[in-house]
């Protein structure tokens, strides 16, 4: 049975049994920061490969399992917008609740 992390760690830890790592600062897949979380923004740099996209979906699942539903919803929205717009970068601004997609 796979070990599930019950809390998002302060320091980088493996995401389930993947080559990706997670921390309170976000998600790193193959040495590329995919999700960066700060007090004011959540940034996504989505590399459109099947592995990185799988890591992102697992990260969203982990956030929900840890009770971080609001952050999970924002990350999932950024993920879907990157896919829909065929973009690599999207940013959520917490101050005004806006999302910007860079195509």
Q: Which role does the model predict for each range below?
A:
Residues 1-103:
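Terminal leader/tail segments of proteins
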């Amino acid at each position: 049975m796979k070990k599930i992390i019950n809390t998002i760690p302060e320091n980088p830890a493996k995401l389930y049994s993947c080559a990706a790592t997670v921390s309170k600062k976000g998600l790193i897949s193959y040495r590329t920061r995919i999700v960066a979380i700060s007090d004011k923004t959540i940034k996504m740099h989505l590399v459109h490969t099947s592995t990185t996209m799988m890591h992102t979906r697992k990260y969203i699942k982990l956030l929900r399992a840890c009770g971080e539903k609001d952050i999970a919803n924002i990350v999932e929205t950024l993920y879907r917008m990157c896919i829909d717009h065929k973009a690599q970068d999207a940013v959520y601004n917490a101050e005004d609740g806006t999302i910007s997609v860079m195509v």
